[in-house]
Swiss-Prot record:
Lineage of origin: Bacteria, Pseudomonadati, Pseudomonadota, Alphaproteobacteria, Rickettsiales
Enzyme class: transferase
Gene3D superfamilies linked to this entry: 2.20.28.60, Citrate Synthase, domain 1, Cytochrome P450-Terp, domain 2
Name of the protein: Citrate synthase
GO molecular function annotation: citrate (Si)-synthase activity
Gene that this polypeptide is encoded by: gltA
SUPFAM superfamilies linked to this entry: Citrate synthase
Cross-referenced PANTHER family: CITRATE SYNTHASE (PTHR42871:SF1)
Organism encoding this protein: Rickettsia canadensis
InterPro entries in the record: Citrate_synth-like_lrg_a-sub (IPR016142), Citrate_synth-like_sm_a-sub (IPR016143), Citrate_synthase (IPR002020), Citrate_synthase_AS (IPR019810), Citrate_synthase_bac-typ (IPR024176), Citrate_synthase_sf (IPR036969), Citrate_synthase_typ-I (IPR010953)
Metabolic or biological pathway, per its Swiss-Prot or TrEMBL entry: Carbohydrate metabolism; tricarboxylic acid cycle; isocitrate from oxaloacetate: step 1/2
Note: Citrate synthase is found in nearly all cells capable of oxidative metabolism.
Family: Belongs to the citrate synthase family.
Catalysed reaction equations from the record: oxaloacetate + acetyl-CoA + H2O = citrate + CoA + H(+)
Length: 411
């Protein structure tokens, strides 16, 4: 039997159905409140509001659980590669060997971008932030694929593959342009992660040999960042998509949202914070500053809007960070890592942080890994966008296949 909750407004009782979740919390359906009760709900930041039905990602923040299509994130990070996870998010199941091979071949074929896009990059000054370039470049793809301007006629699968394939190419192009080096074309003989590293670090006069430890670490980072329920950027993509905007425009809005320091820019902020702390001796002083509500200093990389336990992605990245720095000979002499390890140890024992359930999040160690790889801090959010494009496209595809989908219109 259906369950209801009763809402009493001005003496009149309204019965609101409770929708059963397949896993996690149930949901109260308030969709009729506005029309029948002559009022609507107020929920700043949508802290208690589900905007859609989704079967893509599940999070239990109290228990520190993250699953893609029912698969635990740690299992996927340990046993899968990024395009295998991309297939899982888009299609709902892990691919067979044949499906995986066909999917990866399609992604490789579509990794090349139109030559005329090169001229767009030349319009930016060399000091432009790579995310600013990415915003323009991704949006400009609409001009190269006019057939997708009518989303109802779009091939959702081909659109997703094109986007996943071209974002890393444009990301590497934005980096190369910022440092004055020539663009490097994709190499279809390399896998997804190897190809990106090749486009980032190879030059016409020198081949880049991909370190397998670096490749494995970046593969894990991409998997961990691929999707995360209805966060700010994903919700932005869905809202833009609900109006019928073309997919390239939708993804560019996601990139804009991701650029914010409270969202995708947090790992860059962690690096800046660790540099500001400077040495382990200064940690107690900065812990005190973080506790002082009148002090503008904030401890970046701790706490999460959803997780009230240790972020499962952070646990994977802490281990990965040690592997990368050991491989590069930086495990004992990386000052940022030493500060991060001691800062985490002190914070996890401090009652202030324990009471507020402020644990390290995914951004705490990812920036250290990137920096050790030779990736500059202004590129951190760009790499986040490469990974999250998979989630955005899975969510965009799911939204357009949802019979309940309507144009978003918050009150």
């Amino acid at each position: 039997d259906s369950e209801f909750v009763e809402l009493k407004i001005r003496g009149k009782i309204f019965k609101l159905p409770i929708l059963k979740a397949s896993i996690g919390e149930d949901v109260i359906d308030i969709s009729r409140v506005s029309s029948e009760a002559d009022c609507f709900t107020y929920d700043p930041g949508f802290m208690s509001t589900a905007s859609c039905r989704s079967t893509i990602t599940y999070i239990d923040g109290d228990k520190g659980i993250l699953r893609y299509r029912g698969y635990d994130i740690k299992d996927l990070a340990d046993k899968s590669d990024f395009l295998e996870v991309a297939y899982l998010l888009i299609y709902g199941e892990l691919p067979s060997s044949e499906q995986y091979n066909n999917f990866t071949k399609k992604v490789a074929v579509h990794s090349l971008v139109n030559e005329r896009l090169h001229y767009l990059f030349q319009t930016f000054c060399s000091s432009s932030h790579p995310m600013a370039i990415m915003l323009a470049a991704v949006g400009s793809l609409s001009a190269f694929y006019p057939d997708l301007l009518n989303f109802k006629e779009a091939d959702y699968e081909l659109t997703a593959i094109r986007m996943i394939a071209k974002i890393p190419t444009m990301a590497a192009m934005s980096y190369k342009y910022s440092i004055g080096q020539p663009f490097i074309y994709p190499d279809n003989s390399l896998d997804f992660t190897e190809n990106f590293l090749h486009m980032m670090f190879a030059t016409p006069c020198m081949k880049y040999e991909v370190n397998p430890v670096i490749k494995n670490a970046l593969n894990k980072i991409f998997i961990l960042h691929a999707d995360h329920e209805q966060n700010a950027s994903t919700s932005t993509v869905r809202i833009a998509g609900s109006s019928g905007a073309n997919p390239f425009a939708c993804i560019s809005t996601g990139i804009a949202s991701l650029w914010g320091p409270a969202h995708g820019g947090a790992n860059e902020a962690v690096i800046n914070m660790l540099k500001e702390i400077g040495s382990s001796e200064n940690i107690p002083k900065y812990i005190a500053k973080a506790k002082d509500k009148d002090d503008p200093f904030r401890l970046m990389g701790f706490g999460h809007r959803v997780y009230k336990n240790y972020d499962p992605r952070a646990a994977v990245l802490k281990e990965t960070c040690n592997e990368v720095l050991k491989e590069l000979g930086q495990l004992e002499n990386n000052p940022l890592l030493q500060i991060a390890i001691e800062l985490e140890a002190i914070a996890l024992k401090d009652e202030y942080f324990i009471e507020r359930k402020l644990y390290p999040n995914v951004d705490f160690y990812s920036g250290i890994i990137y920096k050790a790889m030779g990736i500059p801090s202004q590129m951190f959010t760009v790499l986040f966008a490469i990974a999250r494009t998979v989630g955005w496209m899975a969510q965009w595809k799911e939204m357009h296949e949802d019979p309940e989908q309507k144009i978003s219109r918050p009150r």
